[in-house]
Amino acid sequence: MFRLATLNDKPAILQLIAKYIHPNHVYVRRSDLFEYDFACADKLNIAVIEHDGSIEGIFGYFFYNYSLEPDIGGMLWISSDRAQKWSPLAGIQLRDFVLRSVKHRCFGAPGANVKTKIIYETFKKRWMPMEHFVCSLRPSSMPDFLKIRLEPLRMPKNICYVSQIRDFDEIKTLDPDIFYFQCPIKDLAYLCWRYFDNPFREYLLWRVDIGKTNMLVVIRIQNRGP
């Protein structure tokens, strides 16, 4: 049976993560981080495969915005050995259950392997790169579809003004259209949840101005916290 999870399912979900991902997974070590990422009142933004009272699969999701037809992203996808025996496509069916149950305009799969493209196409899904600003200290590790408009981090010929954003109110001074010209669309609630109120991850945000063009560059500080 497929259903949407509640907060009461947290212990069973963490057990599944420990068994099928790693017993020392960050969500297993820090259940408060798990709740920050997935809890919404007494619900969890997770769908589960349940059989005889046992949770045998999970598919997590999050909201990029809270419009009437929001963009959502998928994360934390597990299908147990038992679930695969019942149905080799149990994981795919669970993901499709989420897409049927959660109203949305666009579904994104951050970190999806290019090798899975044929699977999505088999199920008549449209494959397109997510238009994020992606940066790396190693150019060889950058994906082919990397899109940094006007390449602000590569010293464009235009005069480039860079300033660090230290307060959430400064985000509101950016041209809001920059969040609507890319997919997925991010709203202020997402930016606050992800980058400013997040007590578990540390980010640096930079405003880049080239002429009349505003850009937002986000850098995650690694190896701090969980």
Write out the residue ranges for each language-model feature.
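Short amphipathic alpha-helix that is part of the acyltransferase structural core
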Residues: 1-43, 48-50, 73, 148-190
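Tryptophan-centric aromatic hotspots in well-structured domains and transmembrane helices
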Residues: 31-38, 59, 125-127, 193
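A short catalytic or substrate-binding loop motif that flags glycine-/basic-rich loops and adjacent residues
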Residues: 39-43, 52, 185, 198-201, ...
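Short, high-confidence coil segments that cap the C-terminus of an alpha-helix
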Residues: 44, 102-104, 201-203
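Conserved beta-strand in the GNAT
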Residues: 48, 54-63, 73, 212-223
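Acyl-donor binding region in acyl/amide transferases
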Residues: 65-139, 222-226
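Oxyanion-binding "anion nests"
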Residues: 179, 183-207
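Flexible internal linker/loop segments at domain or repeat junctions
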Residues: 181, 185, 217, 222-226
